[in-house]
Amino acid sequence: MTEFENLTYLHGKPQGAGLLKANPEDFVVVEDLGFEPDGEGEHILVRILKNGCNTRFVADALAKFLKIHAREVSFAGQKDKHAVTEQWLCARVPGKEMPDLSAFQIEGCKVLEYARHKRKLRLGALKGNAFTLVLREVSHRDDVEARLQAINTRGVPNYFGAQRFGIGGSNLQGALRWAQSNAPVRDRNKRSFWLSAARSALFNQIVNERVKKPDFNQVVDGDALQLAGRGSWFVATQEEQAELQRRVDEKELMITAALPGSGEWGTLRDALAFEEAAIADEGELQSLLLREKVEAARRAMLLYPQQLRWNWWDDVTVELRFWLPAGSFATSVVRELINTMGDYAHIAE
């Protein structure tokens, strides 16, 4: 299994180095749900601004303030503790008057707005996130500038970031130990983290092997293609290859890679053979996913940061702004720009 730091670079290994997150204000994330509150219903959507506290801690504090069980407060995704983040929490308060949430105060957290909503906010139910990052002590400015131009055109590999695998790869190591034993794992959080790490590592390995190919973004017979921004996909045939390639080149379609698990992977013929060969040495992790009935899925092979723009504050400091769809990692963009001082594992997804 290829370690995250050794995964193939689309634009070659960066020449420069720099600091990511010298302070929390250098990593700003604004959640984009893709919809507005309904204005009615038994739930309350609460938009918060936080710095120095993690999402679960704030959700539990909100539940305590509202005098409801912690499970009645949900969110679409975890946001980093050591960053400035805006996100939505959702509290189920059936039959209750609208509370005055301006009175909800904890250190490092502020309520920006709140409104009634009809449905629970579920994990993953967001459109994406807008990022503002500041990279400091950057060397080789010309190389970074050229890479920004290239990323704007060609994107980056859509790798799962190092934080998916835990500090020191602990989640992936846990998955491997589990795969090698028949002992049940009863801790639900560990099960979730370890299975997610296993499937993500296999996906990264498939993308890693494909990006090594000079023609990696050429449609192969049997590829599973996805409409940009959509979850559904279809299988490419040789007869359609020229037209499908045109649509891939125009970023209307995305070539996907497998998130292995039980059931059909989605690819056929040449594409399926390639994916199977890419992870042929990872039988233990594949067997674990089958044993635990984790359903196979697809994920775009490339990631195109949207609305990408940048501003050099001076020769060694650059501010980046971009938007990424849900499930994508800002650190997978940054790794194509600079070699960061430190690691990514402490940065929440």
Swiss-Prot record:
Q: What does this protein do?
A: Responsible for synthesis of pseudouridine from uracil-13 in transfer RNAs.
UniProt source species = Citrobacter koseri (strain ATCC BAA-895 / CDC 4225-83 / SGSC4696)
Swiss-Prot/TrEMBL catalytic activity = uridine(13) in tRNA = pseudouridine(13) in tRNA
Question: Cross-referenced HAMAP family, in alphabetical order?
Answer: TruD
Q: Which GO terms describe its molecular function?
A: RNA binding; tRNA pseudouridine(13) synthase activity
* Residues forming the catalytic site: 80 (nucleophile)
Limits of the TRUD domain: 155-303
* Family assignment from sequence similarity: Belongs to the pseudouridine synthase TruD family.
Report the protein name in the record: tRNA pseudouridine synthase D
Which InterPro entries does this entry report, sorted A to Z?
A: PsdUridine_synth_cat_dom_sf, PsdUridine_synth_TruD, PsdUridine_synth_TruD_CS, PsdUridine_synth_TruD_insert, TruD_catalytic, TruD_insert_sf, TruD_pseudoU_synthase
Look up keyword tRNA processing and say if it applies.
yes
The coding gene here is: truD
Please list the GO biological process terms of this entry.
Answer: tRNA pseudouridine synthesis
Q: Name one GO cellular component term.
A: cytosol
CDD domains on file = PseudoU_synth_EcTruD
Report the PROSITE patterns cross-referenced here: TRUD, UPF0024
SUPFAM superfamilies annotated for this entry? Pseudouridine synthase
Q: What is the lineage of its organism?
A: Bacteria, Pseudomonadati, Pseudomonadota, Gammaproteobacteria, Enterobacterales
EC numbers, comma separated: 5.4.99.27
